[in-house]
Amino acid sequence: MSRSIKKGPFIDDHLMKKTLKAKEGKDNRPIKTWSRRSTILPEMIGFTYNVHNGRVFVPVYITENHVGYKLGEFAPTRTFKGHKGSVQKKIGK
């Protein structure tokens, strides 16, 4: 179920403060965040965010196409290395 329109998009307060501070200071350094649940707003376009995926920080550069999505959608948490059985079958043949 999607979020109600009357509530508006969710973004953590500390992340919005960091974004506005970087915007007024013309700072080009990446903004480090653990807030994967925050929605990407138009004010965030042009900035790079280091989004934590549970192990490392993944750099995400925000463009117009990212608006409306969550930050966590661009920092995958799982890595698929393949099924063990299929590799052994190829070697055995």
Swiss-Prot record:
Swiss-Prot/TrEMBL keywords: Ribonucleoprotein, Ribosomal protein, RNA-binding, rRNA-binding
Molecular function per GO: rRNA binding; structural constituent of ribosome
GO biological process: ribosomal small subunit assembly; translation
Domain of life the protein comes from: Bacteria
Key word S-adenosyl-L-methionine present: no
PROSITE patterns (UniProt xref): RIBOSOMAL_S19
Listed InterPro entries: Ribosomal_uS19, Ribosomal_uS19_bac-type, Ribosomal_uS19_CS, Ribosomal_uS19_SF
Pfam family, one: Ribosomal_S19
GO cellular component, one term: cytoplasm
Family: Belongs to the universal ribosomal protein uS19 family.
Annotated function: Protein S19 forms a complex with S13 that binds strongly to the 16S ribosomal RNA.
Protein name (record): Small ribosomal subunit protein uS19
Gene designation per UniProt: rpsS
